[in-house]
Amino acid sequence: MPRNASVRARSFAADHRSGCSHQTLHTKKTINAVAAPRSNSAPRFRETEFADYAGIMSLLARHGLSTPGIEQWKYLWLGNPSYTRQCPLGWVMEVDDKLVGYFGNIPLAYELEGQQVRAASGRGWAVDQDYRSFSLYLLHAFFSQSETDLLLNTTANVRGEAAFCSLGGVPAPNEITQESAFWITDATGFSELFLRRKGVPFHSVLKYPVAAAASVLQHIRQAAPGKMQVERFAGFDEKFDRFWNKLRNEKRAVLLGRRDRATLAWHFHYALKKNNCWIFGVVQGRELLAYAVFDRTQHRELGLQRMRLVDYQSLADLQPLAAIISLAIRCAKEAGIHMVEVAGCRIEARVKKELAPFTRPIRATCLYRAPHRALAAQLATPARWDTSLYDGDSSL
């Protein structure tokens, strides 16, 4: 067990150990046993070490994936409140001392019905073409963790989803729509980027009129928040700890990722450091009633900049999202960002009514595997899920 297990909240696995639906497949000491027969070119599998950084970044770059700096990469674990030394950093596949495969492993903390759910999210799964037939060994190692109650994959492509499900993973039965809502905040720049790209039909740009920016501002005026005051925060303070204690009680019946001050500060540390993060909240007196966090992303080919909603939480029946998005749209326009987007989460009907966004189809998938029968039974119910880009590694 992790060293700090005695001071942790009650663990789901501790209360339901007898309900485990399978035996752990392979421990970290026997990962090599599932590899191919040994030969000069047969891959070897082992746990990731921090010293693997250069090899992993080279591999990720070959596959067009993001390559963070070494300090940012290490911070995924060393700055993570949920990380212990017993938690694997991930697994690598190597041939002749060259890394040809990688599967990252990020520990996360969740709660459900007052019990701690120890989760892990996959990250950065990449395997060189010549060794794709061994890809499932990396996923197998991820599934074989013995100190984890819930395994998540929120960024899988179609092939990755098929592989995840082939080993027992399933899509979360959430009610997330397969479309995003967005507002154009720099109509001229938005159109120019698309017209510069070869093969983009002109009519696809005309769907989003040049007058969109003026239209957005008009909708903002129509959606005046009245007495609801939305503020912008420079970071996460003690109000977020108090808010989290209230939120976890109100949403006991929902699988909820930890959102205390320390965890939020870790999750958004580098986004804040690079001025790519906006934190908005509704405050009454000294208390936080709702908050939303947006980050900035850029399309690699187009250069299109988006401000996207990552996390939104609200107490009781308060519905401030329309007012928050209105302020986000203003900030995006001032920052020269092309669009504001809400995707991968439930969108309040009030937002669509008051702010009249454009929409586009997307692929929003949250895959999971719960080894313990009791937790698996609970998570089979749609009401247990309320996912967003905060979950898994979607915004790390």
Predicted feature descriptions by range:
Residues 127-145, 153, 318-330:
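Conserved acetyl-CoA-binding loop-helix of GNAT-fold acetyltransferases
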Residues 46-125, 232-312:
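A conserved beta-strand-loop-helix scaffold within acyl/acetyltransferase catalytic domains
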Residues 32-37, 75, 81, 150-215, ...:
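Active-site/acyl-donor-binding loops of N-acyltransferases
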Residues 26-50, 212-238:
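Conserved N-terminal entry element of GNAT/NAT acetyltransferase domains
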